[in-house]
């Protein structure tokens, strides 16, 4: 690899819209994000499950199978 062409890699503070902050490595000093693991519904357990029937399920309901 050539020397002097790569950006400097440093510690970066990641700030979420919910107020959570954590450190990671990046070429930027500060990274702002809209959603993180502290406020994302999948990680917090507030996830809503949509019950979408597939084509096979609709066929089975229609013809009384299973």
Curated annotation (Swiss-Prot):
Residues of the signal peptide: none
MF annotations from Gene Ontology: metal ion binding; rRNA binding; structural constituent of ribosome
Cofactor details (free text): Binds 1 zinc ion per subunit.
One Pfam family this sequence matches: Ribosomal_L31
Essential cofactor(s): Zn(2+)
Biological-process GO terms, alphabetical: translation
Domain of life, source organism: Bacteria
Binding-site positions, Zn(2+): 16, 18, 36, 39
Record key words, sorted: Metal-binding, Ribonucleoprotein, Ribosomal protein, RNA-binding, rRNA-binding, Zinc
GO cellular-component term (any): ribonucleoprotein complex
Subunit structure: Part of the 50S ribosomal subunit.
NCBIfam families registered for this protein in UniProt: L31, PRK00019.1, PRK00528.1
Function: Binds the 23S rRNA.
Name the record gives this protein: Large ribosomal subunit protein bL31
Species the sequence originates in: Bacillus pumilus (strain SAFR-032)
């Amino acid at each position: 690899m050539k020397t002097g062409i790569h950006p400097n890699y440093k510690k970066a503070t990641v700030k979420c819209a919910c107020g959570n902050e954590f450190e990671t490595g990046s070429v930027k000093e500060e990274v702002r994000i809209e959603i993180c693991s502290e406020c994302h519904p999948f990680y917090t357990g507030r996830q809503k499950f949509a019950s979408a029937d597939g084509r096979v399920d609709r066929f089975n309901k229609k013809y009384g199978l299973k």
